[in-house]
Amino acid sequence: MSRSKMSSQRLWAVRAQFLLLWLLLWAAPVPWAEARRSRVSLPCPDACDPTRCPPLPSCSAGSALVPDRCGCCQVCAAVEGQECGGARGRPCVPGLRCGAPFSREPSGRAWLGTCGCAEGAEGAAVCGSDGRTYPSLCALRKENRAARQRGALPAVPVQKGACGDSGTTRAGRLRTKYNFIAAVVEKVAPSVVHLQLFRRSPLTNQEIPSSSGSGFIVSEDGLIVTNAHVLTNQQKIQVELQNGAQYEATVKDIDHKLDLALIKIEPDTDLPVLLLGRSSDLRAGEFVVALGSPFSLQNTVTAGIVSTTQRGGKELGLKDSDIDYIQTDAIINHGNSGGPLVNLDGDVIGINTLKVTAGISFAIPSDRIRQFLADYHERQLKGKAPLQKKYLGLRMLPLTLNLLQEMKRQDPDFPDVSSGVFVYEVIQGSAAASSGLRDHDVIVSINGQPVTTTTDVIEAVKDNAFLSIIVLRGSQTLFLTVTPEIIN
């Protein structure tokens, strides 16, 4: 065989081997071929079928379940440094972004990237315990990993925002959207005042605190509305504003039947005022906010809804009352009396008056307050001073059958009586307190006349300079003499 023929055969053999090797490589699932196929984007279905989703996976630390690229199934998001994208478009955890490769892929192909910090995220800066401001929490963690590798102390995120931030940064989207109560309080609180009442001690002749309450400013020159039962005569009334300024107040008008009072301070500057809304427009279910100073804790805020807009006084056992109270589940505690009940517009729709139990409180409607202020203004225009009024200094209820049964259930020693007026609070420092009346006494007679309703007591106070009262207390029958206080 000639040499040229042998060389030709060897050449064809080599070519055949290369061809066979190429065919084998093309058919075999080698890694680079599999990687190439994985970079082809999988199409999203026309309609999601949750039953075809795989079981929920257990995500590694730092990861979280998020919707996949198509929004059909839940997948574990990639954390920093892990691959993202690919055929199924694996997402990164919130706060990270999937970094794209430098080369542009053809249309319809998916690229594999790496999750990393989202640079330049607005408002994502954090302050570290090392005093440095990092562009994001992700950037701080990246620095911490490098610090641990070189044996340095990692920094702890101590504050959202720059280290020099004074804390007055704008609230986040959710806080801005849902914290409507805070917006109401910010608007209303400067007009709410704390009332501290003092009485003179008979032993030391010094003024000592006797009770407290709340009120709200209705005129720039210092007129303040509160509850009548908050005030007692012959006492010093000290008003403290939100800014801490203190003034002594005088009583301008008082109506014990409405349980409303108007006092006046002499401020150095104009004061912020609250406007009265229309309680007749109030609807059951509306959000309301109660502000005041319960237990002398100033600037206390509670919120709730209106349970009913017209709870008649007769339903509360107040047979002589013609007021339809606003019932709310906003908590009104002792000391909250006289504070405003406002709607979400910041308008006063009631004055906090009475708490029966947790979740059941009552307010006098603003329409009654408006009429009270209008009557006062009319008297001022006509030059008429308000009539002298007498003040006993107690809060009372007619002793109904239901109330009698409840009191006997709570106190086995409660007087065995079928009618009378139940005293549920005696105002400290008042004429009633000085005479010896106590909480939970039962008044059965005044000046020889039987007493069955609160109207009997009010009329007796109005028509007499002094009162001879028969009181039942437990198993005792007491005879007390009371001289009502005169209020101008």
Swiss-Prot record:
Residues 40-118 form the IGFBP N-terminal domain. Its main location: secreted. It is found in: Secreted. GO terms for biological process: positive regulation of apoptotic process; programmed cell death; proteolysis. Residues 384-476 form the PDZ domain. Residues 213-373 are annotated as: Serine protease. One of its GO terms (cellular component) is extracellular region. Residues 1-35 form the signal peptide. Keywords: Disulfide bond, Hydrolase, Protease, Secreted, Serine protease, Signal. Pfam families: IGFBP, Kazal_2, PDZ_6, Trypsin_2. Disulfide bonds join C44-C70, C48-C72, C53-C73, C59-C76, C84-C98, C92-C115. One of its GO terms (molecular function) is identical protein binding. CDD domains: cpPDZ_HtrA-like, KAZAL_FS. Its EC number is 3.4.21.-. The active site is at H229 (charge relay system), D259 (charge relay system), S337 (charge relay system). Belongs to the peptidase S1C family. Serine protease. This is Serine protease HTR4. It comes from Rattus norvegicus (Rat). The lineage of its organism: Eukaryota, Metazoa, Chordata, Craniata, Vertebrata. The gene is Htra4.
